[in-house]
Regions:
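Short, surface-exposed loop and linker segments with low hydrophobicity and enrichment for Pro/Ser/Thr
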Residues: 12-16, 28, 63-64
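Short beta-strand-to-loop capping motifs
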Residues: 25-27, 72-78, 114-117
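Short N-terminal binding/cap micro-motifs at the start of the first secondary-structure element
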Residues: 30-33
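Short, surface-exposed acidic-centric catalytic microdomains
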Residues: 36-79
Length: 148
């Protein structure tokens, strides 16, 4: 679902495509606080933000505390590589460090789950809660973060 947006810079008209993205958000360390902080940052980085509810899930493949997980659907004129770089930068700004995950601590996890309807991170889509979150996002998206 690409739409064109026109940007005029010093009299030069540049066409940029608008892309629809879905971002997976998760945290198992002070999750309510960290998800809210991530949400505040993501709403400044992307447009037309719609949120699924956030749900608590048990960790898979980690010995850790439960996770708080949710999805964000948004629009951007950035390409896929730029979105991924922006998400990794956001994780760092929000306090994620390379050693944390090895220790079972996930301050924040931001994954590009879909770009223009094409799924990414296929393994993550296999988690049962992802289907629940996507259904909720499609049925009744929220304009604000709803933490259950």
């Amino acid at each position: 679902m690409n739409m064109e947006s026109k940007v005029i810079l010093q009299g030069i008209r540049i066409k940029r495509m608008t892309h629809r993205i879905i971002i997976g958000i998760g945290s198992n360390f002070q999750p309510t606080e960290n998800v809210r902080r991530a949400g505040a940052l993501l709403t400044r980085l992307f447009h037309d933000c719609e949120w699924s509810p956030f749900v608590t899930t048990e960790p898979v493949g980690l010995h850790s505390d439960p996770f708080l997980n949710g999805l964000l659907r948004a629009s951007t004129t950035l390409d896929e590589a730029e979105v991924n770089r922006l998400l990794k930068d956001a994780e760092s700004r929000l306090g994620r460090t390379p050693t944390d995950k090895r220790n079972g601590k996930v301050v924040i996890d931001l994954d590009l789950m879909a770009f223009d309807g094409q799924r990414r991170h296929e393994r993550n889509w296999l988690f049962p809660f992802q289907a629940q979150l996507l259904k909720a996002l499609n049925d009744k998206p929220n304009n604000i973060i709803d933490i259950i």
